């Protein structure tokens, strides 16, 4: 069974490598840099899923991203809202990554991107606008805090997309001692979402995706 899954993943990966984008060279450059410098960016599977959700939900115009990294996921999402006069607000705590993302955004053909440098646990509260889509991919131990603060800004019918919710698989297999607190918080966060929200799903895509819709 595991061998079949591996073969299936390799097949899927070969297909989604045929990615089309006006910023294709830049995207490839960011992917290469992330691999060399060990920068955490979204997987190709998540990239495709994000694109699909945003592309097919025409009401998504304003997006909040918690965790910019070097701008990879921001570019992917922003491309899908350009013809809607949409806007991306993206928060990053690391100054070096913030600057790299800034450079990457400037190299792209994209408009309507607002970067914020700071701790999302503080910066989200300062935002005075609402969003149709929220993407969370930052410090795993703070996921519940990020969610609670940003959900207040989510428009009716909006979606929260939480990436890496399975945290390298440590939620269902033995984890190193240094990760025990994060694993416990993530496990409790998943229970919290299922207990308090009706439109919730947990999907085994890449390192796990949690979706919450505001109905």
Question: What are these model-derived regions, one by one?
Answer:
Residues 1-133, 140-161, 165-215:
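A short alpha-helical cap/connector motif
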């Amino acid at each position: 069974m595991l061998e079949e899954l591996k073969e299936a993943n390799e097949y899927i990966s070969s297909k989604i490598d045929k990615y089309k984008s006006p910023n294709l060279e830049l995207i490839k450059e960011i992917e290469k840099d992330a691999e060399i410098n060990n920068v955490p960016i979204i997987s190709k599977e998540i990239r495709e899923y994000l694109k699909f959700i945003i592309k097919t939900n025409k009401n998504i115009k304003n997006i909040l991203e918690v965790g910019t990294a070097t701008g990879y996921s921001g570019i992917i999402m922003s491309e899908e809202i350009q013809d809607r006069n949409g806007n991306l607000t993206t928060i990053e705590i690391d100054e070096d990554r913030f600057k790299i993302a800034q450079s990457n955004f400037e190299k792209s053909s994209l408009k309507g991107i607002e970067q914020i440098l700071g701790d999302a646990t503080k910066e989200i509260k300062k935002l005075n606008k609402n969003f149709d889509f929220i993407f969370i991919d930052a410090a795993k131990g703070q996921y519940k805090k990020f969610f609670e603060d940003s959900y207040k800004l989510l428009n009716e019918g909006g979606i929260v997309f939480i990436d890496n919710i399975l945290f390298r698989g440590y939620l269902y297999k033995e984890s190193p001692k240094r990760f025990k607190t994060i694993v416990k918080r993530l496990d409790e966060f998943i229970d919290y979402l299922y207990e308090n929200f009706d439109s919730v799903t947990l999907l085994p895509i890449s390192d796990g995706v949690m979706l919450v819709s505001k109905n």
